[in-house]
Structure formats: structure tokens, C-alpha cells
Amino acid sequence: NKWIPLLSPNLSKAAAFKVGESQAAVSVRIDFDSEGSARDWEFCLTQIQPVAEVTSEALTALAGRKPRSRAIPTALKTIKDQIGQLETLIFCAKALHAGELRQGQIELDLPTPDLETLGDLRATAPDGGNRQWIEPLREEDPFSILATFLRAAHSTWTQHCLDFNLPALVLQANEPESGSLNDVAKAAIALDLPLSLDEEGTTSASELAQALISSPSRRVLNLQLRQTLQDPVFRLIQSK
């Protein structure tokens, strides 16, 4: 009943990033416009040497820091030289996340409960894993910020492969059935939530998710909406 990781302990140790140690990596430089869309990019093999480790405690202290304050909270003292970079990263993460929502990404506030009884189910991939929705951006959570950039890198890599006719594995999912979405929409309308419908009286999953954000019943409706979303599956893009 023990969890068996995909990588052996030796490979996991060899591939891990540690502060002050150089490590081989695949890096990407992406230029985004004001709408959060990638305009130019470059993938390359690099050597990465981390200079600091950022914790949720540090990000919480950064979020609570007063603008223009010269005082540095205790949680930020070990990374005081990187505060400016962190603020830039958070700004970029906000812009990318907003761009995802404008492009129709579905946002559900359904974090995995940190219950010991869940065992390995508590662990999810930094980018959200194999699902058709994303969680809200949490500025105090390092993995939430990292997930935004990982999704951007994944999306750019997919577009890169399509542009250059390269074989690649991509995650794809079918659209939810309109009947299932209508059931969630009816529940939202019954709670007097503002909801826009098209000429056929239906709405998209992303628009429905956005309408639920301000609702006190958001979690219950998010759970119902999640049940309408099909799990993505890997598909191989063949080179022609």
C-alpha cells in the first residue's frame, strides 16, 4: 500500500533543485502582451543555480507588507535581495491568470483538503494535474504562483510543437454536455445570481464559473460544476 513514485530515489535526488547548487534544466523565455497572450518564446537547455527558497510564510509576510515600507519582516530577511523579483513575479502571475480567465479557462475554488487520511491524494502536480479547471491564484502560496507559469509554459510548448510540426503529447478534453451545464445554471439562477444566457438559453462552463465567484454558495455550485467536466486525456500530436 506504499506510494511508488515514477522516479527512483537516485533520479529524484539527481534532478532536484537546491539552493546554491547548479542543476541542468530546460528553460523557456516567453514574451507576453498586455492580454497575457504569448507573442514570442525560446526554449533552451540551461544550468540553473537557485539563490533562495521562497516559502508560504515569506509570501504571506510580503503580502502584508505596507507599500514603501523600509522595514523588512523577519520572514523576508533571508530573501531581502529578491523582494523586487518576487513582486515582479506576482505581478506577472496576476496578469497571466487574468488572461487565462479571459481566454475561457474555468476557475473553481476547490482546493484539496490537507487531511492525513487522504494519503497520496493530497499531492497534486504543481500545475494542477490532469483536470479541466484551475484554482484561484493565491499570492501567499508558492505553488499557486508556480502553477500559473507552468501552465503558460505548457501552452507555449504545445503551440511551439504545432508551429514546427513536432510530435508531442497534449492534454485534451471534450466540452461538457449542455444538459449538465443547464442544471448548474438553473441552481445559480434560483439563487438570484446574475447569469448571461445565449439565444438557446445556455451558457459556457467558463462563464458559469465566473458568475459563481461572488456567491456565498460558490463551493457547493463549484462541486456541481466540476461533475460536468470530463477528465482530460493525453493525445499524441503526430508530425506530418
Placement of each model-derived feature along the sequence:
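Electropositive polyanion-binding surfaces
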Residues: 1-240
